[in-house]
A protein has these predicted regions:
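ATP-dependent carboxylate-amine ligase
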Residues: 2-174
Length: 174
């Protein structure tokens, strides 16, 4: 409503605003929701830092799902001396959440897995992988109808490759 009021104050007609909303296109890799075969995949692979990882975890915690919650993370890069502590802190936050599966790709993300495992307050299955393909294959074995997956990592960790590898068999079978 505030957006319409702002548009109106700028002289934009209601018809123009409706047309703009109708033509809106989601920006790829930024909280992009993909629904297929009864599952939801949130592709938030454009970039990552400690705050955006916390927000992604919050999104996953709050999303309405009938199934399991999968948090698939890559390394948070370019944090300098804060890198290891940031990954350990993320793991602690994951441990206190309602995430069912933590899947990591990369050596720094693996630190988050270690911390999550050490601090888990409920059943948390953890998969640590060196490659995107290994992570995607793990997901293909574990994910079921009703599950929600959120994939996130720094640009340099190329977590979009996990999304592509995971969706590839689905696209070929359709």
């Amino acid at each position: 409503m505030a957006a319409f009021a702002t548009g109106h104050s700028l002289g934009i007609t209601g018809q123009e605003m409706n047309l703009g909303l109708k033509n809106y296109q989601q920006i790829p890799q930024r909280n992009e929701q993909i629904h297929y075969e009864g599952m939801t995949l949130i592709n938030d692979t454009y970039n990552a830092n400690p705050q955006s990882m916390r927000e992604a975890l919050k999104t996953l915690k709050e999303i309405n799902t009938q199934g399991k919650r999968f948090f698939i993370i890559g390394d948070m890069l370019e944090l300098g001396p804060l890198s290891e502590p940031a990954h350990h802190e993320l793991g602690q936050e994951i441990a206190g959440s309602n995430v069912d599966y933590l899947v990591t790709v990369g050596p720094l993300a693996s630190l988050a897995a270690e911390s999550a495992k050490a601090n888990a307050q409920q059943q948390l299955e953890i998969g640590r992988f060196a490659t995107h393909t290994e992570a995607a294959n793990y997901l293909l074995r574990k994910v079921r109808k009703g599950d929600c997956l959120l994939v996130k990592g720094s640009r340099g960790s190329k977590m979009e490759n996990v999304v592509q590898e995971f969706l590839k068999p689905k696209k070929q079978s359709n």
